[in-house]
């Protein structure tokens, strides 16, 4: 069984890109924002902002970060690990958690195995704590996304090799591609 991964970091720092790369290792994911948009956010906001459909609501999420953060927190107010349990029931990656209280509730319930921070602070700003209260020090690992896409792929591969080795797991055949050999000595 694959270890469950919580992938976090500031907005637009590459979390979804990292999760897409993790699919080569057998993982599945859906952005937590997309999951929540489909589950309840679109229904709650469609009349307020005049969204024609869920896709339009989801595409506009960056303009309402604090509002989404608060809505997701309200969804979890009586059970801080609720969303994590729901997401991990369908996927083995939770991509995009933003609330530290929910983070610690899930960690205490051992809902995920590893928390991974995606960092791109050399190029992009950090978020205001009103929409992101998780901090890098809380996570088990950090993936550096301050270079190019090839380097990011190498960094993801290095981390996954470490995690798989520590768990006694074999890497999937899909990771034995020329892409991964390109950085073998770097």
Regions found by a protein language model. Give the residues of each.
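Small-molecule kinase domains that catalyze NTP-dependent phosphoryl transfer to phosphate-bearing small molecules
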Residues: 117-185
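Glycine-rich phosphate-binding P-loop
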Residues: 6-22
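ATP-dependent small-molecule kinase phosphotransfer cores
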Residues: 32-92, 98
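Post-Walker A helix-loop "phosphate-sensing" segment adjacent to the P-loop in P-loop NTPases
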Residues: 23-31
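Short, acidic/turn-prone active-site loops that include or flank metal/cofactor-
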Residues: 10-13, 32-37, 118-126
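ATP-dependent NMP and nucleoside kinases share a basic, alpha-helical "lid"
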Residues: 84-133
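Short, well-ordered alpha-helical microsegments
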Residues: 15-16, 37, 99-104
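Extreme N-terminal starter segment of soluble prokaryotic enzymes
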Residues: 1-5
